[in-house]
Amino acid sequence: NAVENIAISCELIRSHVLHLSTDFVFDGTAGPYKENDQPNPLHFYAESKLKSEEIIKKNLTNWSIARTIIIYGITDNMSRSNIVLWAKGEIGKGNTINVVKDQYRSPTLAEDLAKGCISIIDKSAYGLYHLSGPKTYSILDLVYQVADFYNLDKSLINPVFSASLK
């Protein structure tokens, strides 16, 4: 287990480890969530992130965990996508996209996440933190904002319920 090996090695040198996690450790039925709310992961990715958090807590003295939500921003060479770039790209190509209208998230600008992580390390702030953007949007509203910002055709956005994507 990579996380366990890293945690054990870092504990040997008393390193402060900052582990990035996700809001997916929650089931999404009662947000926004606080750090002490009970996780309830619904799929493998979420379960693996929660297990990693538990490994960090068990094996380290100096640990911080930062749970974040929908990281977005411009990437070098567009080498990695995010919801903003995906929506811009697909609508920009004239493709119709299905976007959930019943999920709400607080998207996080990558630069803001980096500043939050630096602050945690600089202040030796140990424990569990939720780092996200200041506003909560439906995924649909977020994608509509992307379309508005880039002056794209919003008629290509097809609102759907999450259950229809399963």
Where are these regions (language model features)?
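Mid/C-terminal beta-alpha module of Rossmann-like enzyme folds, strongest
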Residues: 116, 123-166
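NAD(P)-cofactor binding segment of oxidoreductase domains
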Residues: 1-18, 50, 55
